[in-house]
Amino acid sequence: MARGKIEIKRIENSTNRQVTYSKRRNGIFKKASELTVLCDAKVSIIMLSSTGKLHEYISPSTTTKQIFDQYQNTLGVDLWSYHYERMQENLKKLKDVNKNLRKEIRQRMGEHLSDLSVEELRDLEQEMESSLKMVRDRKYQVINNQIETFKKKVRNVEQIHKNLLHEFDARDRDQHYGLVDNGGDYESVLGFSNGSSPVFALSLQPNPPNDLHSGVGSDLTFTLLE
């Protein structure tokens, strides 16, 4: 039974397409190798897959460059001359641009002005004034930014100073600020243990001011600790 004819069209499935490409590429390279051995032919094959991957085959008796050189000599064409001419044209254009830029730079530095006409000098003057204005505006912008940053730092320092003043003021208003009620154990407050050297301990008793004149007793009592 005869085999059905396979329709030649693009394989839509990417996996199947890559598998088919790999199989047929190997088959072509095998045929090229057979031509090289059986017929003493010089074969060069360059293949690019749909993913851009390069595959090539070259007969062991030659090189890719030799194949291209022989191709050019046989057909009488130069594959590289066109590209070389394009490169030379681009190089010339770049040199001209570079020359003009250097000339403009020297003119803006006050050099090579003798060949300029009055109109050209006026245009150059306007360009330099415009450039000077842009530089000056940028300078003022940088200065203003630095001033604003400095003002923010000053405001932060002033706020810290204000908070500290409020804290000290609160301490002055609160008579018991920082005192610890430990039941009269002044030795533990002062950090002395039994058997230490005699010291005078200050006992603070918040009695009314009138007691000073009534003879009840002073709010300051000195006790000798032994």
UniProtKB/Swiss-Prot annotation:
Pfam (any one): K-box
A single GO molecular function term of this UniProt record: RNA polymerase II cis-regulatory region sequence-specific DNA binding
InterPro entries referenced in this protein's UniProt entry, alphabetically: MADS-box/MEF2_TF (IPR050142), MEF2-like_N (IPR033896), TF_Kbox (IPR002487), TF_MADSbox (IPR002100), TF_MADSbox_sf (IPR036879)
Highest taxon listed in the record's lineage: Eukaryota
Gene Ontology cellular-component terms listed: nucleus
General function of this protein: Probable transcription factor involved in flower development.
Protein name per the record: Agamous-like MADS-box protein AP3
